[in-house]
């Protein structure tokens, strides 16, 4: 510690209960200007202890409207997450061969994330099966880890596809390297995100940044992010008929797919880059420090 440090305001940004506790203890032990900020992302009502901890914070923020709705009081501000728009770029901005080129001769409906029912993969498969049968040049690509406890779930999904005679059009890639994800997003003709519940949901931002048309469920931050019919489509979680209708609309209209993809990319550049997230956080830090 130095005299200069004693006059500085230190921001402690907590994201979990244990971090709020650490910050409160630190504030008592270290005699410096410490301001504590908490980000609430949980989409559930907090325990009494957590609510008490939040009441001791200098500021509480959230990442989306859905998470904010569970707080006992309105957060000071909403600061959504962002993505690296240089990493997740549209096809037109990428030169050279992609790792996903083996998929390029067909059209693909993709869904990303660890394979389990919570992600709405069963909804997607049931919605897509008749469309795959009617469009043999389209595939369903499920990108994500299959843990041992989910193997039976996957077997049931494959049996469902086999019963509709489209098993060869349903691909489970398994867990993919992090570096392969940008090219996999670009390889998709349509990206879906159909979670029944979601904390925030970066997958949608990554797909939109990649210039892909997105169908997302009304979960996590997705209703905040997507302007339906302008830069993506929104469906209710678990709504098979609605999801099938949205898929059919995009399968049948290439121009609409391209329109949504272009608008999606612009939405990310305007509002959801990681640089913009950092700028908003720094601005909020400065506002807290000045009070």
Residue ranges and their predicted role:
Residues 196:
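Aromatic "clamp/platform" in nucleotide-sugar-dependent glycosyltransferases that forms part
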């Amino acid at each position: 510690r130095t005299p200069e440090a004693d006059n500085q305001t230190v921001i402690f940004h907590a994201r979990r209960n244990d971090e709020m506790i650490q910050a409160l203890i630190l504030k008592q032990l270290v005699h410096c200007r410490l301001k504590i900020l908490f980000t609430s992302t949980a989409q559930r009502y907090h325990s009494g202890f957590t609510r008490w901890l939040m009441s001791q914070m200098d500021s509480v923020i959230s990442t989306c409207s859905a998470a904010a709705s569970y707080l006992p009081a309105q957060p000071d501000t909403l600061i959504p997450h962002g993505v690296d728009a240089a990493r997740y770029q549209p096809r037109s901005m990428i030169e050279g061969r992609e790792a996903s080129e083996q998929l390029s001769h067909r059209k693909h409906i993709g869904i990303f994330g660890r394979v389990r029912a919570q992600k709405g993969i069963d909804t997607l498969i049931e919605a897509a099966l008749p469309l795959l049968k009617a469009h043999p040049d389209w595939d369903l690509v499920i990108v994500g880890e299959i843990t041992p406890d989910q193997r039976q779930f996957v077997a049931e999904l494959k049996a469902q596809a086999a019963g509709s005679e489209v098993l060869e059009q349903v691909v489970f890639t398994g867990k993919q390297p992090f570096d392969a994800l940008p090219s996999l997003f670009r390889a998709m003709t349509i990206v879906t995100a159909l979670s029944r519940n979601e904390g925030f949901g970066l997958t949608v931002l990554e797909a939109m940044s990649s210039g892909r048309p997105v169908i997302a469920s009304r979960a996590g931050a997705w209703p905040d992010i997507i302007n339906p019919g302008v830069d993506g489509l929104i469906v209710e979680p678990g709504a098979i008929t609605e999801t099938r209708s949205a898929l059919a609309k995009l399968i049948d209209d290439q121009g609409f797919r391209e329109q949504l993809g272009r608008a999606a990319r612009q939405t990310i550049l305007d509002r959801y880059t990681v640089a913009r997230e950092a700028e908003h956080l720094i601005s909020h830090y400065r506002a807290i420090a000045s009070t």
